[in-house]
């Protein structure tokens, strides 16, 4: 029972960390995209193709690229790419990012999304530390109670 509780706590903590790491990686990816649009003037399909190689969030960019290749408008493909993303807050930030207009407007939208994702990742890290302490305290209290009941 103790081992099961410890494994459950560990799984919860790892899942939460993965979501936080994904938000941070998304912020880095969007920052990279904004820089490449600004300096290299790369087209969006090439940018999505590059970001599709990322470990934690590449699948979202790949789905967006797939939608573009099927003929979807950029904004629709972008929103579809991030529809099932976790954490849901990050998905909302990305779906709300408007990729319409000229280069300057797109770069501005990506940069704003980067800042919001970085804030989300920072907030989740702070919450995660507190949640980890509570989980372990609850698990140890439960284990102690179980041992007392056995005695």
Segments predicted by a language model, with ranges:
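Hydrophobic alpha-helical transmembrane segments of multi-pass integral membrane proteins
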Residues: 2-4, 139-144
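Short, non-transmembrane cytosolic segments of multipass membrane proteins
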Residues: 75-104
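Residues at alpha-helix boundaries and the short loops/turns that link adjacent helices
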Residues: 54, 68-71, 100, 104
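Cytoplasmic juxtamembrane interface segments
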Residues: 64-80
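Membrane-interface, cytosolic juxtamembrane amphipathic helix immediately N-terminal to a transmembrane helix
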Residues: 23, 97-140
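Amphipathic alpha-helices that form helix-helix packing interfaces
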Residues: 26-29, 33, 64, 90-94, ...
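Juxtamembrane "helix exit" motif at the C-terminal ends of alpha-helical transmembrane segments
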Residues: 143-151
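Juxtamembrane/interface alpha-helical elements of multi-pass membrane proteins
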Residues: 1-66
């Amino acid at each position: 029972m103790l081992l099961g509780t410890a494994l459950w706590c560990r799984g919860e903590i790892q899942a939460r960390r993965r979501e936080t790491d994904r938000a941070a990686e998304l912020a880095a990816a969007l920052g990279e995209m904004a820089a490449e649009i600004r300096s290299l003037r790369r087209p969006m399909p090439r940018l999505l193709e590059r970001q599709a190689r990322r470990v934690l969030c590449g699948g979202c960019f790949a789905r967006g690229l797939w939608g573009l290749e099927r003929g979807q408008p950029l904004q629709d493909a972008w929103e579809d790419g991030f529809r099932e993303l976790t954490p849901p807050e990050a998905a909302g930030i990305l779906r709300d990012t408007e990729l319409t207009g000229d280069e300057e407007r797109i770069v501005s939208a990506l940069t704003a999304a980067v800042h919001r994702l970085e804030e989300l990742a920072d907030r989740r890290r702070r919450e995660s530390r507190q949640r980890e302490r509570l989980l372990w305290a609850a698990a140890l209290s439960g284990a102690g109670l179980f041992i007392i009941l056995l005695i």
